[in-house]
Amino acid sequence: MEAKAIGKTIRIAPRKVRLVVDLIRGKNVKEAQAILMFTPRGASPVIAKVLDSAIANRTHNLNLNLENLFVKEVWANESITMKRMLPRAKGSGHLIRKRTSHITVVVAERE
């Protein structure tokens, strides 16, 4: 049985989130939490929060322990992009894209 948690519209670019997400895919839950705790990236605490939510969904809704729990799937998709203008010379402007992410974590029990 699987449990899923989704973090929506996280204010970090998906390209940066995917660097951290690739580290925990397929790992045991405890090992994934340790990796996220010691990874010096801005996306690490956010992914850890979504992972904790998926674990809580699994233990609360299905009344199971987390001994054999592992990260089955994890991915980061692009969300909305906020657009801002930066004034430049001669009355022109450059577009600044502030990208956001949807982070999905699926945990399952290893057989």
Curated annotation (Swiss-Prot):
Biological process (GO), any one: translation
This protein's GO CC annotations: cytosolic large ribosomal subunit
Alphabetical list of Pfam families matching this protein: Ribosomal_L22 (PF00237)
CDD domains: Ribosomal_L22
Coiled-coil positions: none
RNA-binding among keywords: yes
Biological function: This protein binds specifically to 23S rRNA; its binding is stimulated by other ribosomal proteins, e.g. L4, L17, and L20. It is important during the early stages of 50S assembly. It makes multiple contacts with different domains of the 23S rRNA in the assembled 50S subunit and ribosome. The globular domain of the protein is located near the polypeptide exit tunnel on the outside of the subunit, while an extended beta-hairpin is found that lines the wall of the exit tunnel in the center of the 70S ribosome.
Quaternary structure annotation from Swiss-Prot or TrEMBL: Part of the 50S ribosomal subunit.
Family: Belongs to the universal ribosomal protein uL22 family.
Protein name as annotated: Large ribosomal subunit protein uL22
Naturally occurring in which organism (per UniProt): Acholeplasma laidlawii
